[in-house]
A protein has these predicted regions:
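Charge-rich, well-structured scaffold segments of protease-associated domains
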Residues: 3-5, 9, 20, 67-217, ...
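Active/ligand-binding-proximal structured segments within catalytic/core domains
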Residues: 13, 20-72, 246, 256-268, ...
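A glycine- and charged-residue-rich anion-binding loop/surface
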Residues: 18, 37, 55, 214-215, ...
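Extreme N-terminal starter segment of soluble prokaryotic enzymes
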Residues: 3, 14-15
Length: 423
């Protein structure tokens, strides 16, 4: 097991966390910024994600994207980033003797990005192609439509990538303003995990992030209106399969029942022994893929279900899924099934933390979003303490038919018919 993460707050307010893994031969370096698509406005949809792209496009020290990439790849590492609703993360994974390179490159990118108008125009088309690619993937697009159905015309319901039109209108001044609002202490966490010491990490971060800005970190609007905003949304496409996504409001990030929901989700739709897999696929043969997942945000959460079914089986598949939701909210889970779900959830949690990258990502995100790092054994203890009465209680909180939203992408989709199915 790794040692307990160590945390230091630098004089400017930036937080540094190190998770030492002495057996590793590498280190992961992650910089978390508490800025995601929820901070955007109608005009700036996609700004957080577009800026993430632009951070890779050169600095005075490394004037091109190729030189930025070569700095890490030439050290034997990998470099990437992602944007979510409430955060953006830039990361690399390098051999342990190249830790300084990993930290210095990310600091250079985030502090000194050129953001040249010419490069912005070039990358604009790349981002628009990414948006088109998502639209061309029916399963991914059904997920985007589910967000619209649940949250409507507000940041939680918008695509993180924005639209082709909003991306087309973003300019250098928008990126500079966004950086001033969000990219600074105490809104930044640097998380390192692997074969190193906290003293070494804190010293390097203090050196290369010494000019850390101060972020304004404006508050984001809470989820407004009724959720779901629409019960059903669909898009007709001449394809062979109907891609079904269902979702309902779940629990926010700090809710004490989040551990119970993890167990409930395992019972419902995680793995080949889950209820949805057994009932929808194995017993009825309605789908090849079916499952559920939970996501959490500061003030809301989502329990989402996805399935790929034959067009003629959409109604039956949704009916069966709704019945399984009802059962979990009304009938206690048997002890054997509960024990297996707890073991599966605990095992999956432990297996997900096998690498320095996973440990560093968890520690950094925890510190940024929760203000603390939940000890691994505390999470395991809380998962193992979940009882059948907890599952049915949380099932009654979350698994409510009147709050289920449905999206379908496939042939002959009609929203009126979908609304009838889910009502």
């Amino acid at each position: 097991m790794p040692v307990t993460p160590e945390v230091t707050s630098l004089p400017g307010g930036l937080r540094v966390v190190t998770t030492q893994v002495a057996s590793a031969q590498s280190v992961s370096v992650s910089v978390f910024v508490g800025a995601g698509s929820r901070g955007e406005e109608e005009r700036t949809k996609g700004l957080a994600h577009f800026l993430e792209h632009m951070m890779f496009k050169g600095t005075p020290k490394r004037p091109s994207a190729v030189e930025v990439a070569e700095a890490i790849e030439g050290a034997g590492g990998v470099l990437n980033a992602y944007t979510a609703k409430e955060l953006t993360c830039y990361w690399n994974h390098v051999p342990d003797d190249r830790l300084e390179t990993g930290i210095e490159v990310l600091a250079d990118m985030l502090h000194n990005a050129l953001l040249s108008p010419e490069e912005i125009d070039r990358e604009r088309n790349v981002v628009q192609q990414e948006i088109k690619r998502t639209r061309d993937q029916p399963g991914a697009w059904a997920g985007e439509l589910l967000g619209q159905a649940m949250y409507g015309d507000q940041p939680m319901g918008w695509s993180t990538a924005g639209t082709e039109d909003t991306v087309a209108a973003l300019a250098q001044a928008d990126f500079q303003e966004w950086i001033g609002l969000w990219y600074g202490a105490p809104n930044v966490v640097v998380s390192v995990a692997g074969n190193t010491s906290h003293e070494t990490v804190a010293g390097l971060v203090g050196r290369y992030f010494s000019d850390e800005r101060t972020a304004q970190s404006p508050s984001v609007a809470s989820v407004g209106g009724s959720v779901p905003a629409r019960r059903a949304i669909g898009e007709a496409r001449p394809i062979a399969q109907a891609n079904v996504a269902m979702g309902m409001p779940a629990l926010p990030r700090r809710d004490p029942d989040r551990y119970v929901l993890m167990i409930l989700n395992s019972v419902l739709g995680r793995g080949m022994s889950s209820r949805l897999f057994k009932e929808v696929r194995e017993r009825r043969g309605l789908a090849y893929s079916v499952g559920s997942a939970v996501s959490r945000h500061s003030d809301t959460g989502i329990l989402a279900i996805s399935a790929g079914v034959s067009p003629e089986n959409v109604r039956e598949a949704v009916r069966v899924i709704l019945e399984e939701l009802d059962k979990l909210a009304q009938e206690p889970v048997g002890q054997d099934e509960l024990t297996k779900a707890r073991d599966y959830t605990v095992g999956g949690f432990r297996l997900s933390l096998e690498t320095p990258m996973a440990l560093g990502q968890r520690a950094g995100e925890n510190l940024l979003t929760l203000g603390e790092i939940e000890p691994i054994e505390d999470v395991v203890e809380k998962l193992r303490a979940v009882g059948a009465e907890d599952v049915i209680r949380v099932g009654q909180r979350v698994l409510r038919r009147e709050r289920v939203a449905l999206s379908v992408v496939g042939p002959d989709v009609e929203e009126e018919a979908l609304l009838e199915i889910v009502s």
